[in-house]
Amino acid sequence: MAGHSKWANIQHRKGAQDAKRGKLFTKLIREITVASRTGGPDPGNNPRLRTAIDKALVANMSKDTIERAIKKGSGAADGDNYEEVRYEGYGPGGIAVLVDCLTDNRNRTVAEVRHAFSKAGGNLGTDGSVAYLFSKTGVVSFSADLGEDRVMEPALDAGADDVVVNEDGSVDVLTAPDQFEAVRDALEAAGLTPESAEVTMRASTSVKLDKEDAEKMIRLLERLEDLDDVQNVYSNADISEDILAELG
């Protein structure tokens, strides 16, 4: 799978840093608010909201805070009017990067994203410059402890497109976006608890990076993730577990 497990590791490291800076909750609340506004306040009928709530619960956000964010998005409370914006660019070694933002000020956001790219040796591209390298994909991820054999049959029976074992032994179940909910629910009903489950942007091909470019790439990803308006960053970078461990 094109860089998914490696990026999951980078995200995990970054997630810990974000939590310390108080940024993670801000981003989760913003996502819950927008998901509620665009798809309604019932997570049973709003897959995006359910995913956002699941992430918030994993991050130990209180149910009261989650409920306030849902009400804010559904119009039961006053709130900022955020819009979704996607930027495309290039990282070190020509790595393709997608940056999804929720912003109340496009001018501020594009300036900050452009600055992050330039400071890390990349550059902001034009619309369509790299988006064609990614496809919207449901990904239900399981730990290495569970193993491929436990996951494979129920996943394929539920309508998954593929089951991929990553370098670290973790298992990713890939689905079409419109099958994501059904597959996730079927796996949970079979007693399999995912580490994460979301509809994401998956690169069709990946680019292996050496240590030097990997270090630059991680710096770019961290600069982008540090921005308040940035919700998700996707790339087609393939960074080996060994290099990630070295860069620690």
Swiss-Prot record:
Gene3D superfamilies: 1.10.10.200, 3.30.70.980. Keywords: Cytoplasm, DNA-binding, Transcription, Transcription regulation. It comes from the Bacteria. GO terms for cellular component: cytosol. Signal peptide: none annotated. InterPro entries: Integrase-like_N (IPR017856), TACO1_YebC-like_2nd/3rd_dom (IPR048300), TACO1_YebC_N (IPR049083), Transcrip_reg_TACO1-like (IPR002876), Transcrip_reg_TACO1-like_dom3 (IPR026564), YebC-like (IPR029072). This is Probable transcriptional regulatory protein MCA1220. It comes from Methylococcus capsulatus (strain ATCC 33009 / NCIMB 11132 / Bath). The lineage of its organism: Bacteria, Pseudomonadati, Pseudomonadota, Gammaproteobacteria, Methylococcales.
